[in-house]
Amino acid sequence: MDKEKDYFQEDGDLQEILGRFENMLNQLGASFFDVYEFERIIDHYLDSNHFTKAIDAVKFGIDQHPGSATLLMKEAQIYAEKGESSKALEMVRSLEKIEESNNELYMLKGMILNQLGRVNEAESAFDKAVSLSFENLDDILYDIALSFEFVNQYKIALRYLEKAHRRNPKKLNILYDIAYCYDRLHDFDRSIGYYERYLDREPYSENVWYNLGLLYYKKENFQKAVECCDFAIAINDQYASAVFNKANAQANLGEYEEAVKTYKESIQLEPENVLAHCYLGESLEKLEAYSEAIEWYRKSTEIDPSYAEAWYGIAVCYLFMKSYQDALYYAGKAISLDEENPDFWFTLGNVHAHLGAHTDAMKAYAKTTELDPYDDEAWLNLAHLSYLQGETAKAISILKDAYSYTFDIPEVNFYLAAYHYKLHKTDQALKFFEKGLKLDHTAYIAVRKISPDMLDEPRFKDLLKKYFPSWTSRKRN
């Protein structure tokens, strides 16, 4: 209660000070303010991004307190926060000549140097500030770390955070930021360890449980991700992000019915969440509830008509429903919004193939391979359409062009074997057939689609027996 009284008293004092200052600005009377009061006025304007008024306050302050290092530092801070970092640095360097033992000056210098991208110089300035500091070192080290976090220098930030942690191992904000930095550096196990230490001291932090869930999600431990999100939701049942990410984890576990329920809960909390609507549609699609999936995909497009993935989801559902003309329209709509997505082009190719438009299908598959040369299915479909058009040599050429990307895909090798066999190039066929068997002997059935009589040839049978010992007995059965 006393702290609350102090807060309101302080706030009331500030309002009185600001009122007097505003009157002075409006030429309604002169007022005198001490340096501390000017600091409070300037900080108030900085917090609300009123830079012009902050500069006015500095000017009045220096008029009343000529040569005040504190106010001159505030002026440099204003220019730094305005984005005029070079000008701010000049001011700080001038002040260094008269305030060489002022730790706050070197803190400000370090922050400005970080803004300018001069990270090594910033470190030197901060280290100077630390050497001149004798109180609250853990807070100073923490503030330095935040400056490096702000410019994405997480390794450097960690050095200062770990020093701060050694000085004050019980301070939760330090633990939190250490965990955050390790997360940003993709050292997920260490990040988890520090968040768990945090929870040992403060088990009711919904944000830390949520962050922990995200880390397990990144590690693809989706069950643990669900559990962490559940803890966050138990603490705060209105925590929309935790509900949404719980649904994502459930979907990744293949628990689509549960995911559908959780996405609906997420939408109740965030009715305009375009991703929740789209992912709900995707979960229903996985459950083969295509009509309902389309409804949710449509709702996603109503929230954001430019969200290509939702239009694509509608196309996929219509493809599964064999409504190929509808699928064609929505695949085209998705591509019109995002021409660089290989999945969209692949689906367009499939739709054209089902409609018998083989030339258009081949163009779409070719575009897919251009955008993603590792898409083996697109290469295989492109080659097979050439084969169906009587161009077996071209089919071989396509898969050979793809081979540097797809050499480790068994089906690619089996297709090459079958196409070579069709052209009576048995030695080449044997070579690719054996490569395919080495990669996955069970995938040999791919050749039946093209050259089933291959498997009656003695040399191919011998290879099957070599790499697939149970093949002979399976054949008899």
Where would I find each of the regions flagged by the language model?
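Position-specific recognition of the canonical hydrophobic site in helix A of tetratricopeptide repeat
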Residues: L46, A80, N114, E149, ...
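TPR/TPR-like (Sel1-like) alpha-helical repeat modules
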Residues: A418-I445, F468-P469
